[in-house]
UniProtKB/Swiss-Prot annotation:
Any GO MF annotation of the entry: serine-type endopeptidase inhibitor activity
Ranges of biased composition (kind: Polar residues): 209-221
Region (Disordered): 140-309
Biased composition (Basic and acidic residues): 156-167, 181-190, 261-279
Record field: compositional bias (Low complexity): 168-180, 196-205, 290-299
Protein name stated in the entry: Ecotin-like protein 3
InterPro entries to which the protein is assigned, alphabetical: Ecotin_C, Ecotin_sf, Prot_inh_ecotin
Family: Belongs to the protease inhibitor I11 (ecotin) family.
Pfam families: Ecotin (PF03974)
PANTHER family per UniProt: ECOTIN, PTHR35890
Length: 309
């Protein structure tokens, strides 16, 4: 803490029945000190007021200037005490410091101390006042200041009551997701990997059924239905679906066999029709060749009969 000798300012010594009080102010920005800060001097005296009423002192605070230096200092005189409020303000805590009625406001200057001369039984208190503009600027700076990064929470062990009689009453509260670690005693946590495996097996089964029922000659059947993990099929539904797929395969196989039989019958019909055509042609040729012989034979027989006659 600095002393008055550090400033090398020759302030006068305290007079009889007086004492010198020095106030050192913290350094601020020069513009802020000049325009936004003020110091209120509150001289007073210690008097115990048992009734709890609010009292004040009469007196004066005069400003004087140090010769050949131009620095101000203040001289306080205290007179009588009088009650400023008749009703007790705080009977349980009676006042012990009675302030002066007039408390002057002086400029804020941290470059030099504030020197006040008061009576020996008096005391000087002070209060620093700031304008609303400075308060707004400070609030804006607090809002614009970067937020302090919060550290990761550490798991905390808490011992809880165990009314159900489980073997492990200690519960560890961690930062994990509730789907993995949030479960009660005796319950198993959710396992997403098993559901994914089950859905993959279901989709592979449906693809196998469709591949077995298809052939190069028939139209392949593919299952485009995807089973989500949270709605997996039960065993009965899987058996029913496999039966339906097998029935579809059987009907598809019967249709293919029917088509093959139809194609073979059509081929046979074509072969039969060709054979019949050949037989008819031969028959027609045979009839054509035999008809003149039949017509010639009776003529020949007639000629022979005539000759014989």
């Amino acid at each position: 803490m600095p002393s008055l000798e550090d400033y090398r300012i020759p302030y006068p010594a305290a007079g009889p029945c007086q004492k010198r009080t020095v106030i050192y102010l913290p350094q601020q920005d020069s513009a802020v000190e000049q325009h936004h800060l003020r110091v209120q001097l509150i001289p007073g005296r210690h008097v115990r007021c048992e009734d709890g009423c609010f009292y004040q002192l009469t007196g004066t605070v005069s400003e004087e200037t140090l010769q050949s230096w131009g620095y101000p200092y203040y001289v306080v005189t205290l007179d009588d005490i009088y009650p400023a409020q008749c009703s007790p303000s705080d009977p349980a805590n009676p006042r012990t410091f009675v302030p002066l009625r007039e408390s002057p406001m002086i400029p804020y200057n941290s470059k030099r101390p504030i020197v006040v001369y008061v009576p020996e039984d008096a005391e000087v208190r002070y209060r620093v006042w700031c304008s609303d503009v400075l308060q707004v600027q400070e609030s804006q700076q607090e809002l614009e200041a970067p937020a302090v990064s919060q550290s990761c929470p550490v798991p905390v062990r808490e011992r809880q009551n165990n009314p159900e009689g489980h073997a492990h009453p200690v519960v560890v509260h961690s930062v994990e997701s509730p789907e993995v670690s949030g479960h009660k005693d005796g319950d198993q946590p959710m396992k997403k990997s098993s559901k994914l495996k089950q859905s993959c097996s279901n989709s592979s089964r449906s693809l196998k059924h469709s591949a077995s029922g298809s052939s190069p000659k028939n139209t392949p059947l593919f299952s485009r239905e995807s089973v989500p993990p949270e709605h997996s099929l039960s065993a009965a539904q899987q058996r029913r679906r496999s039966n339906e797929n097998s029935a579809i395969d059987e009907t598809g196989g019967g249709a293919s066999r029917k088509k093959r039989s139809d194609s073979t019958s059509s081929r046979k019909d074509d072969q039969d029709s060709g054979y019949e055509k050949k037989v008819k042609n031969l028959w027609n040729r045979a009839r054509g060749n035999s008809s003149p012989k039949r017509s010639a034979s009776p003529k020949k027989s007639g000629r022979d009969s005539r000759r014989n006659s």
